[in-house]
Amino acid sequence: GCLGEGEKCADWSGPSCCDGFYCSCRSMPYCRCRNNS
């Protein structure tokens, strides 16, 4: 499965964000999937 909006993600390991989302690490200490539109 993939990660959706607001779910915790990691650039270096899976699972990755779903299509249409990217892993944003701006809101430390966690990275979260955000909509890339």
UniProtKB/Swiss-Prot annotation:
Annotated keywords: Amidation, Disulfide bond, Ion channel impairing toxin, Knottin, Neurotoxin, Secreted, Toxin, Voltage-gated sodium channel impairing toxin
GO annotation, cellular component aspect: extracellular region
Disulfide feature: C2-C18, C9-C23, C17-C33, C25-C31
Tissue expression summary: Expressed by the venom gland.
Biotech relevance: Could be considered as a biological insecticide candidate, when fused to Galanthus nivalis agglutinin (GNA), a protein with the potential to cross the insect gut. This chimeric Pl1a/GNA variant shows a gain in toxicity against insects when administered orally, while maintaining similar effects as the wild-type toxin when injected. Transport of Pl1a/GNA variant from gut contents to the hemolymph of cabbage moth larvae, and binding to the nerve cord, has been shown.
GO molecular function: sodium channel inhibitor activity; toxin activity
UniProt xrefs under Pfam families: Toxin_7
Site feature: Pharmacophore: K8, W12, Y22, S24, R26, M28, Y30, R32, R34
Location(s), subcellular: Secreted
Modification Serine amide occurs at: S37
Function (record text): Binds at site 4 of sodium channels (Nav) and inhibits the fast inactivation of cockroach channels. This toxin is active only on insects. Has a potent activity against S.litura larvae.
Record family assignment: Belongs to the neurotoxin 07 (Beta/delta-agtx) family. 02 (aga-3) subfamily.
Entry remark concerning the domains of this protein: The presence of a 'disulfide through disulfide knot' structurally defines this protein as a knottin.
Name of protein: Delta-amaurobitoxin-Pl1a
Organism from which the protein derives: Pireneitega luctuosa (Tangled nest spider)
Lineage: Eukaryota, Metazoa, Ecdysozoa, Arthropoda, Chelicerata
